[in-house]
């Protein structure tokens, strides 16, 4: 595999057909130049990597970032297979401030966002709860989120506080 930051991309994880929860993220983190350290790279080596449709159960085996989410899911009797996670930008960056302007995106990235916006709108229409872990980009792209009654905008800065917000939100809506 050559050093190309655009190889290991992630559109979304989880249940694309009938989720009980949608989580909005900004993009996969970590340094794309050091792709050997990415959980996606290990999945790639083991033949389990997918840019979309990857089960959260599989993703969690390779990335402990999800452990806190899984603990919350268990506490509210939500299966990981009931969750859909949408990425705004499908490429890894060290920081979300490094996401380029939309006019500099690849066609793949533009198509991924378009697909994810359609999925989000579809599930909002079906009154599925949406948790905005990172949501500011999403509100610009899907303005009806602002008035969606089952949308929670995380105001916390740190992950452990965001996880507490997720737990409280799920207790209220599930």
Give the predicted meaning of each segment.
Residues 43, 67, 71-75, 81, ...:
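Polar/charged alpha-helical tracts
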Residues 63-124:
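Internal catalytic-core helix/loop-beta-alpha segment
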Residues 58-73, 126-131, 170-174:
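Noncatalytic linker/hinge segments flanking ATPase motor cores
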Residues 24-25, 61-70, 77, 137-146:
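Bulky hydrophobic/aromatic packing residues
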Residues 20-23, 79-87, 129-134:
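A structural signal for short, well-ordered beta-strand segments and their strand-loop junctions
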Residues 102-117, 136-174:
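C-terminal capping/extension of enzyme domains
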Residues 27-31, 89-93, 135-140, 155-158:
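Short, solvent-exposed loop/turn segments at secondary-structure junctions
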Residues 1-58, 115-123, 143-149, 168-174:
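Active-site and ligand/interface coordination hotspots across diverse enzymes
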């Amino acid at each position: 595999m050559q050093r190309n930051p655009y190889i290991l991309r992630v559109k979304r994880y989880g249940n694309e057909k009938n989720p009980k929860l949608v989580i909005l993220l900004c993009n996969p983190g970590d340094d794309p130049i050091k792709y050997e350290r990415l959980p996606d790279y290990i999945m790639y080596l083991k033949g389990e990597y997918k840019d979309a449709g990857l089960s959260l159960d599989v993703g969690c085996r390779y990335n402990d970032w999800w452990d806190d989410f899984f603990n919350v899911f268990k506490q509210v009797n939500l299966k990981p297979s009931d969750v859909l996670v949408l990425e705004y930008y499908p490429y890894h960056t060290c920081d979300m401030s490094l996401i380029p302007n939309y006019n500099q995106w690849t066609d793949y990235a533009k198509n991924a966002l378009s697909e994810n916006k359609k999925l989000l709108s579809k599930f909002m229409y079906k009154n599925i709860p949406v948790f905005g872990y990172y949501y500011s980009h999403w509100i610009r792209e899907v303005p009806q989120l602002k008035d969606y009654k089952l949308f929670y905008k995380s105001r916390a800065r740190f992950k452990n506080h965001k996880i507490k917000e997720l737990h409280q939100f799920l207790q209220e809506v599930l």
